[in-house]
UniProtKB/Swiss-Prot annotation:
Species whose genome carries this gene: Salmonella heidelberg (strain SL476)
Name of the protein described by the UniProt record: p-hydroxybenzoic acid efflux pump subunit AaeB
Gene that specifies this protein: aaeB
Protein purpose: Forms an efflux pump with AaeA. Could function as a metabolic relief valve, allowing to eliminate certain compounds when they accumulate to high levels in the cell.
Primary residence: membrane
GO CC annotation: plasma membrane
Membership in a protein family: Belongs to the aromatic acid exporter ArAE (TC 2.A.85) family.
Length: 655
């Protein structure tokens, strides 16, 4: 396919984007809004953003969800702007500097919350800055401007959602159904590899791929939940299926590790069962039936605990999978599974990274302020707005430098494109609403094609072009103003890029170490006799951290194996029959406190000291288990955990 070719699957969304832009433009001028540009710009960004992220037409619900986040972020930003202006109207410079800090604060929060919700916080940061900069000459008009901006943005979002509904958005349900079947087959094949105890690299690739697919399935669940309220039952089942899929991965990998020291635990009967190849979910179903009969015949005690747990989890997976596909009423058996264990949310390991993002956004906005005041450039405020927009949106993504480059390319492309519209097209079509709408529809259609291809600069070009062409009421054509706006966008993106290059993010290694220590803390916290604590389901949170580790350090197998070993230790100790007595309970609390000190230590020396203390306490704990005659199901996992911590002590303590 050529670089400028148009694929059939891209046409529907391109028409959808064009329709959203035209609707926003028509309503904006029909109701005599002062700046219909905001409504058009909002409709374009809300519709095109999910398509750029997805690399194609977004699934149903994605545009609505992004629109709701934009409304929330706009209202938070407007309220913050009003508070700042009312408090500091007599000190304009201080007011702008406080807005710069507010933008940095919102970026800091957006770096810590879920990536899906971070958009609202990033938006609220630069919305406040836009309002404060715009009303510098007429501060008494702040409430009116804030109200107009909110109204125009709500209109733009409404147009994007209406266009999405008119052109029958894609449902993700069929993709979810197919992935559930494919995932179960892949889980079975992973267990086959682990039973064979073959090449470790092949096993690593298999479980790593399953972790990524399970994370992707969780993302699909979020999309399905946004799509319609009729998928509430499917959403509940998919939440439980996420835990079951992670449980299957854990049990398979533990089976592999057990065979490193005790291969005799896996009997010939189960080895023969897992030699049968499977290709479909029906094949897996038949094999699970055979395994359940074998387990009943041999007895639970004669079955390795990992295989017994794996078969049980796979059976529950099949039951819930059928419920998701049919979306029928939840049965009593399913309800028992769904009411299982409360899922625990883990604390973010990227606090240092979030602080770097705070300083990047704050410093770039302050730099823009100084540049504006020093030069006295009439479009310095436009450059400041672009700085805030670029840094707020770029910081929450894995590669902020590429986001900046995308914006730079986009603003450069917007200059000739905007020039064409400003000098030729809009002056010749402003007397006819139909021609004006058609001209912008053509712009939206062709950029909509490129956005779905993730063409570098396409998203920035769409937003920047709409921002600089004259879509105000009434229209005024001042070439110097147009040129200032276009150059202001380019300069703002350049300054933001310079700040991102200068303020280096060196938090990667620290984040990796914090993640690994959180795995250690989770394994240690599983050593408890508290019934409520033992029922807590930390597995989704632990695998979420593992997924983050895999993204931060692609290809670093030793780190992945260490993290997975800690997850296995956590699951095994969580189910271990630890003797219930006050002596052990007190020592469990001491172990948890020491593990928390390891995570929160501010220097390598403190971290090494606390880690050494943790190792000493684990040695004492093993002695206590021997005194209290704990069974091998407890002593062996604790011994393995202690050995792993001794082996990887340097990796867990050094920066």
């Amino acid at each position: 396919m050529g670089i400028f070719s148009i694929a059939n699957q891209h046409i529907r969304f391109a028409v959808k984007l064009a329709c959203a832009i035209v609707l926003a433009l028509f309503i904006g001028f029909h109701f005599q809004l002062e700046t219909p540009r905001w409504a058009v710009l909002t409709a374009a960004i809300v519709a095109a953003g999910p398509a750029f992220a997805a690399g194609g037409e977004p699934y149903s619900g994605a545009i609505r969800y992004r629109g709701m986040l934009r409304i929330i972020g706009t209202f938070i930003g407007c309220i913050a702007a009003l508070i700042i202006i009312i408090s500091m109207i007599r000190a304009p410079l201080l007011m702008i500097l406080v807005c710069c800090v507010w933008a940095g604060f919102c970026t800091w929060i957006s770096s810590l919350v879920r990536i899906e919700n971070s958009y609202a916080w990033g938006l609220s940061g630069y919305t406040a800055l836009i309002i404060v900069i715009t009303i510098q000459m007429e501060p008494l008009l702040t409430p009116q401007f804030a109200l107009e901006r909110c109204s125009e943005i709500v209109i733009g979002i409404g147009c994007a959602i209406l266009a999405d509904l008119l052109f029958s958005p894609r449902s993700i349900k069929q993709e979810v159904d197919r992935e559930l079947d494919s995932l179960l087959v892949a889980q079975y094949q992973l267990m086959q590899l682990c039973i064979k105890h073959g090449d470790s690299e092949e096993v690593d690739n298999a479980w790593g791929d399953l972790v990524r697919r399970t994370a992707a399935l969780e993302g699909m669940r979020s999309n399905l939940n946004m799509e319609s309220s009729r998928w509430v039952r499917a959403n509940r089942r998919l939440k439980a299926l996420n835990t079951l899929s992670l449980t299957l991965i854990t049990q398979s990998c533990e089976t592999y590790l057990i065979q490193n020291t005790r291969p005799e635990l896996i009997t010939d009967t189960f080895r023969e069962l897992f030699e049968t190849p499977v290709e479909t979910v029906q094949d897996v179903h038949r094999q699970l039936k055979r395994m359940r009969r074998v387990i009943v015949w041999t007895g639970e005690r004669e079955t390795p605990v990992t295989l017994y747990s794996w078969v049980g989890a796979a059976t529950r997976y099949l039951l819930l999978k059928r419920g998701v596909i049919s979306n029928t009423k939840i049965s009593a058996t399913e309800e028992e599974i769904l009411q299982g264990e409360p899922v625990v949310k883990v604390e973010s390991a990227e606090r240092h990274h979030a602080m770097v993002n705070f300083w990047r956004t704050t410093l770039s906005c302050i730099l823009g302020t100084l540049f504006w005041l020093w030069t006295g450039w009439t479009s310095g405020n436009g450059a400041m707005v672009m700085i805030a927009v670029v840094t707020s949106l770029a910081m929450r993504l894995p590669n902020p430098r590429m986001v900046c480059i995308d914006f730079i390319y986009g603003t450069l492309a917007a200059l000739p494109l905007g020039l064409l519209y400003f000098l030729v097209i809009i002056p010749n079509t402003q007397q006819s609403m139909l021609l004006l709408c058609l001209s912008l529809a053509v712009l939206g259609f062709f950029i909509g094609i490129e956005v779905q291809k993730r063409r570098l600069g396409s998203m920035g070009a769409l937003a920047s072009t709409i921002n600089i062409i004259v879509l105000d009421n009434p229209m005024t054509f001042h070439f110097s103003q147009f040129l200032d706006s276009a150059l202001g966008q380019i300069v703002g993106c350049m300054l933001a890029f310079i700040v991102i290059l200068l303020v280096r993010d060196k938090s990667k290694d620290r984040t990796g170490r914090v993640l690994l220590n959180q795995f250690v803390s989770a394994a240690v916290s599983a050593m408890t006799t508290n019934v409520v604590r033992r029922k807590e389901n930390r597995l989704p949170a632990l695998y979420q951290q593992l997924f983050l580790l895999m993204n931060k350090f692609p290809g670093d197998l030793p780190k992945f194996r260490l993290a997975l070993t800690m997850i296995i230790a956590h699951q095994r100790l969580r189910d271990a029959p630890i003797p219930v007595n006050e002596d052990l309970s007190v020592f469990h609390r001491q172990l948890r406190r020491t593990a928390d000190h390891v995570i929160s230590a501010g220097s390598d020396d403190k971290r090494r000291r606390y880690f050494g203390q943790l190792l000493d306490e684990l040695d004492i704990y093993q002695e206590k288990l021997r005194i209290w005659e704990a069974p091998p199901q407890v002593t062996e996992p604790v011994k393995r955990l202690t050995g792993m911590l001794h082996k990887y002590q340097n990796a867990l303590t050094d920066s």
